[in-house]
Structures are given as structure tokens and as C-alpha cells.
Amino acid sequence: MRQHVNPLSRFFQLPLELPAPEQLFDDPGRPIHLDIGCARGICLQELAALRPDRNHLGVEIRRPLVRSAQRDRDQLERLNLHYLFCNANVSLEGWMAALPQDRLQLVSIQFPDPWFKRRHRKRRVLQPSLLLAIAATLQPGRELFVQSDVLAVIDPMVALVELSGCFDRPAEDARPWRADNPLPVPTERERYVQELGLPAYRVLYRRNRQPLPDPEELEIAWQRVDNPANDAVPPDG
């Protein structure tokens, strides 16, 4: 059972100064895989063991999950793994902007909390400002991977990424959904979905060489797509 929290509440809107890679990993020079909304972090634990050539950072808005994940990390002594509590839409942009060029090489957003009602659209994890921060940090060819088992969750993410013009899908990937997970370890939610024989909707993107769109123009264009004028959408609450 997912325990939702409202990312728009005052507590979660307080920006946090996140530690630099030098404070998180034994070798901060390794490429970073950033997993946004890592939940209990078991997938990243296994990835850190399989990919010692990378540093793996999981961020999660539910503090108890972060505490448990970090406790496991310490017991396992995974020095290329760390977990941080934060609201990704409030605290990640500055952290990513401070990274050395091409340090961040993969961003994943896997099975995010399903805020699929229109009136809850501002609670979704992938907002235009976060997407632009990711696009500004990733060098051409570096990857953004998104997946969900809820079409009403994945469809807006895909629409926003493609509206930005900053990312392309690999030519060889199936449309509309990639057949498999490019990561060698499934998340806990993904395992659950697979056990039930249900579909998972996946898209892998690679940063292209297009410049970032104007943030205000992207926001306006996104509102037109995500909140058509003829839809009566009550305020968030």
C-alpha cells in the first residue's frame, strides 16, 4: 500500500540544501544515476552492487522510507549508494546545477505516486521546472527513463517530455511503450505488477542537442495540453 504525502503542503515546500557528491560517495567522480521517488530503495541497493562503476542516489519524499533505506545502505556498506529525503521539485534543481559537467548520466522516475486526477496535477513528480532542470544537466546522449503501471500517470509524463523537445526515443525502441526495462533490476512495484501479469508502460529518452525551451512558454504550452480550457478543474486540495 502506497502512503501518499501531499508535496504541496508547507512542510514539503521548504527547500533543503542537499549534500554534494563528495559528502555522499566514497568516489564522487563516478557517473551518477539519480532515481527520483526511490521508495524503500531496494532496487538501487541491487543496482549499486551490479554497477560499482556508478554512484546511485535515491531521493524520496517519505522520510521514514529514506531512514530505512539509508540504514540498509550503512549495514551493507554500499559506498556508491546514498538516499536523501527531499521534495524533488523544490530541492533538486540547485543540486543538479552544481554538479560537474556530465557527472549526472541517468535519471529514472519509476512508478511515481499516482496523482492522476486533474485537480491533483500539481502534485505529480514530473513538473515542467524539474524536467528542464534534468534536461539542463544531462549532456547529449544521457538518459531519462520513466515507467508506471497507470496510463493516467505515464501519459502526462510522456506528453511533457516530448513537448519540451529536449529528448528523443531510441529509434529501435517499440512504440508507444518500450518492451523491457533498460535497468537490470526491477523495482518492488514492478515485481508486484509482473507477478499479477499486469502491464508496465515504459519509455526511455536520450537527451538531444536541442536548446532548452523558455520555461514560461513550456509552462503555458503544458497547461494547454494538460488542462484544456474547456475542462472545469477545481483548485488543488
UniProtKB/Swiss-Prot annotation:
Xref: PROSITE patterns: SAM_MT_TRMB
Listed pathway(s): tRNA modification; N(7)-methylguanine-tRNA biosynthesis
Binding-site list for S-adenosyl-L-methionine: 35, 60, 87, 113
Assigned EC number: 2.1.1.33
Family annotation (Pfam families): Methyltransf_4 (PF02390)
Highest taxon listed in the record's lineage: Bacteria
UniProt GO MF annotations: tRNA (guanine(46)-N7)-methyltransferase activity
Catalytic activity: guanosine(46) in tRNA + S-adenosyl-L-methionine = N(7)-methylguanosine(46) in tRNA + S-adenosyl-L-homocysteine
Residues reported to bind substrate: 117, 149
Keyword Methyltransferase: yes
GO cellular component, one term: tRNA methyltransferase complex
Gene3D superfamilies: Vaccinia Virus protein VP39
Entry-linked CDD domains: AdoMet_MTases
Entry keywords, A to Z: Methyltransferase, S-adenosyl-L-methionine, Transferase, tRNA processing
HAMAP family tied to this protein: tRNA_methyltr_TrmB (MF_01057)
Family: Belongs to the class I-like SAM-binding methyltransferase superfamily. TrmB family.
Protein task: Catalyzes the formation of N(7)-methylguanine at position 46 (m7G46) in tRNA.
Protein's name in the database: tRNA (guanine-N(7)-)-methyltransferase
Species this protein is from: Synechococcus sp. (strain WH7803)
